[in-house]
Design a protein with these regions (language model features):
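Positively charged n-region of N-terminal signal peptides that target proteins for export
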Residues: 1-9
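Pocket-lining segment of extracytoplasmic ligand-binding domains
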Residues: 25-88, 108-109, 232, 245, ...
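A bilobed periplasmic-binding-protein/Venus flytrap-type ligand-binding module shared by bacterial periplasmic
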Residues: 98-118, 252-258
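Ligand-binding clefts/hinges and TM-proximal coupling segments of bilobed small-molecule sensing domains
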Residues: 38-48, 88, 119-159, 163
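C-terminal motif of bacterial Sec signal peptides marking the signal peptidase cleavage site
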Residues: 16-19
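Acidic, polar ligand-binding/catalytic clefts
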Residues: 77-98, 195, 199, 204-258
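Bacterial signal peptide processing site
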Residues: 21-23
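Extracytoplasmic small-molecule ligand-binding "clamshell" domains
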Residues: 44-54, 58-60, 72, 130, ...
């Protein structure tokens, strides 16, 4: 009888320890290095697994190497759930932030004002909305103000880009804003808008995948001319870059396995 009681006590303690261990398990969040998702995760004291892109953050969750991912709501809408690249993942109701997207140019660059005018014209004539519908982001689209009709400086970035004949756009693989189609061509809401800007400038366009954490260095070193990749307009970005008007609403959301 004593042996039986001892065995039952041991089993009870074992189950208690297992339950405690499960309760105290730390959730690991996959985030893109240098992103708004990483910033909010660090602010909340979450344990994180920083990766190169938000697409890789989803891969981490899908592979079981991270418990959850913090990504942009616009990407979650395009990549997560039934009929998407990740049908076994779900976007939870947990919304960590609400934010705005904008493009970033070199500090003091007149390219930002040029892009603003192009976006204003594209919004007014319906082109911007048509592109948004194509990529399913029409509900996030922000109304653009009237064009200012700003005149680029003779020695400014617009003249520099026109002189070299190519607009170099810094991006990451980030559907539905920038991603490759079946032919390996870059498409997406941001990519298509950037193509319109290049056309208005009278230059070719080149998309360059960048390390998101080094985007400001890439700009300042003139490796790229603009960051146009679902960039959140944080105080840090506004201080480091000449940013365009906001054009899309966004949020940081949590994605897990279903």
């Amino acid at each position: 009888m004593k042996k039986m009681l001892s065995l039952l006590l041991a089993l009870t303690m074992l189950f208690a320890l297992v339950a405690c261990g499960q309760k105290d398990k730390t959730i690991v969040y996959a985030v893109e290095a240098g992103s708004a998702g990483e910033a909010v995760a660090l602010e909340k004291g979450y344990e994180i697994n920083s990766v190169d892109t938000q697409a890789k953050a989803l891969m981490e969750v899908d592979a079981g190497t991270s418990d959850a991912a913090i990504i942009d709501s616009l990407m979650a809408g395009a990549m997560v759930g039934e009929g998407t690249s990740y049908p076994d993942l779900i976007c939870t109701d947990q919304k960590l932030t609400e934010e705005l997207y904008g493009a970033g140019c070199r500090k003091g660059s007149d390219l930002a004002a040029f892009i603003n005018d192009v976006m204003s014209e594209a919004y007014a004539d319906g082109t911007m909305k048509d592109i948004a519908i194509t990529y399913g982001v029409q509900e996030a689209l922000i109304e653009q103000p009237a064009p200012t009709g700003s005149t680029p400086a003779a020695d400014g970035d617009v003249a520099y880009i026109q002189g070299k004949g190519t607009l170099v756009v810094g991006i990451t693989d980030f559907a539905p804003m920038d991603y490759k189609d079946a032919n390996g061509e870059w498409i997406g809401f941001d990519a298509d808008m950037a193509k319109i800007v290049a056309e208005k400038l009278g230059v070719k366009i080149q998309f360059v995948e960048i390390d998101w954490d080094n985007k400001v260095f890439e700009l300042d070193g003139k490796a790229i001319d603009v960051v146009w990749n679902g960039m959140t307009l944080t105080d840090a970005m506004l201080a480091a870059m000449e940013c365009t008007n906001a054009y899309c609403n966004n949020a940081q959301v949590v994605v897990t396995k279903g």
